[in-house]
Amino acid sequence: MNKIITMSLAAMLATLSISAQEKTYFVSPDGNDGSDGLSVESAWKTIHKVNTVVFQPGDKILFESGAVFKGQLKPLGSGSEGKPITISSFGGEKRPVIDFGEAEGAGILLENISYWEVKGMEITSKAPFKIGVGRQGISVTASGADHNLKHFVIKDNYIHDIWGQMGGRGENVGYYSSAILVRILRNRESFRDPSYKPSTINEVRIEGNKIERVDKCGIVCWGARDNVVVRKNYMDNIGGDGIFVNGPYRGLIEYNVIRRSCMRAGAPDLPGDDGWWPHVAACWIQDTEETIMQFNEVYDTGRNIYNGDGFAYDFDFNCKRCIAQYNYSKENNGFLLLMYNIFENVARYNISENDKTHLVQMQGSLKDDNNILYNNVFYVDHGLLDLDFFRGNEKETAKDINDLGAHFHNNIFYATGQGQFRTAYSTGETWKREFDDTLRPDLPSGSMFMSNCYFGPWKSGIPDDPKALVADPKFIAPGTGGDGLCSLAGYRLRPDSPCIGAGTYIPDNGRRDFFGQPVTDGKTDIGAFEYLGSIPESDPEKEAALDKAAREASSVAWARWSFPKVVATNGPSRFTIRLREPITDDIKGQISWTNPDNGKTYKLDISKLKDRRTIAIPVNANVSVPDGTKVKVSLTNGSFSEEFEIPVKEVELRNRWQ
């Protein structure tokens, strides 16, 4: 019995000891840095004092409500799982203010530390722009090698009047000058060091923050990989990008409101060196897989002369299987940008009202990239709005119009008043872009457009759509969108709409429309609204079969995309095919190459190349491979097959392999 009591007492004392380590520190203008900071009466006075303490898991650092604290907060120490270190306020509802004045860098810098949460703070600089100086409100930074940072919550903060350099080169300018910045910093030399261990950042939540009057960006999350969420943030008057997220796997960007972004980037008189990045957008992603942008609102982007962007949304380089859905775009300089080298991205059930200039700009391959826009609504009542197939800056090297674009299904294009649409191919720089709306690709009918509704004028005619519905879709009240997703009920269909049941079924469609109505199997409606009562009962077996077929076709398309467009050489003994992604286990087939010297064909079995990114193909001795030689690739997953050729440039290939 005594033993049990002794053990219980020991456990209790251990618990009390652990709890005692979790301290709450107070900071007040009336405090004293010589105090212990552990009560309001013994509060610290300055940020400088806070920066000298190494904090422990579960600690809290509370600044006095409504008070102003000068300087840059750079705390030390890390929290732990379930015990983050928190920066917040005490003593009232007003936010404490961190004012870091003319200093370069961040108002709050969390560098090479983990498990931190910043809540309910106000961060500002108010200092005027200074050439070469970049600034951030809150920065999470992994600098140097082999730091594995984790768990950052930046929530309910007000960040404003932070003026950094819009471009240039340096650790704090350009994209690194923003209200909230999450980044991994490494120097150029590290990319040439094979022993270098890159740092990582995971578990980032940026939520409920208000951001106003900032240059360059609102929120930048660059390099964080897993569990990245950017949600319910509001921003207005941003010089460059609103939200830019680079690098996550299955990230989530939702319920954000972005007003007047892209306001100063690309201005011809903007001071700075030649390292500007003038092309900016409101909400965009890059180098990311299966990331979702949804329920966001973007209004009134700017577009200065050297900014070729100004889009509300953007799938940028190396976006793979990402989705933009249930978003709203109003009076922006473009709805969506599709860069090249992006694959199987989806834009669905979005509404664009009175966007300007380029509605959608496409820079990638129609066949290889396989991006799709379906069940969106595009409304315009003034100005010319382009589906812009951008072929490049120079006419001499312009992209082939037969391999440029995206797939458009079940969309409504609605032009009224002084508005009209145009399909055009463009070349040239932003400030002197040339459009040709007479070009038409030589593609089978329906290769790009299928089952869309067209109402109102199209300069040079509507696209080639074998199932085009040229009719009034009969919206309830088109053009009446205001502020908020709830203002868009006017884009619901009337019961007599010809769009009801006229669409093409799309598998894996998210199972809901813009307004939350279920989207099931059967005759899908055209547009962002699925009219209840127009669809027969769902057939689960048929729907599952359609989804399975789509996934199977997708795996072959994905394998094809993994192959490059040109075969490179690799020394004297072989040439190589460098894959973008490893080939998955379900893909079978072969790679073959015919020696132009002796006509002999060499073959490699795909099954021997699993989990390999580089395929080395041996060649005959002293062979000159003429321009136009092809490497043939055949792929199958048992249900779907693909055959294609990859050209080899003119190179000298020498070895002894026969």
Q: What positions do the PLM features span?
A:
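Acidic Gly/Asp/Thr-rich repetitive segments characteristic of extracellular carbohydrate-active
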Residues: 29-64, 68, 497, 525
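Right-handed parallel beta-helix
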Residues: 84, 88-93, 114-125, 147-163, ...
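Right-handed parallel beta-helix/beta-spiral solenoid domain characteristic of secreted/periplasmic
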Residues: 42-44, 62-63, 78-132, 161-175, ...
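C-terminal accessory segments
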Residues: 466-532, 547
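Surface-exposed, short loops/turns at beta-strand junctions within beta-sandwich domains
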Residues: 621-627
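Short, T/G/N/S-enriched strand-turn elements that build extracellular solenoid repeat scaffolds
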Residues: 48-54, 69-78, 287, 340
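Predominantly extracellular beta-rich ligand-binding scaffolds that present long acidic/polar faces
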Residues: 71, 76, 323-329, 343-490
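Extracellular beta-strand/beta-solenoid scaffold signature
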Residues: 74, 100-109, 131-144, 167-197, ...
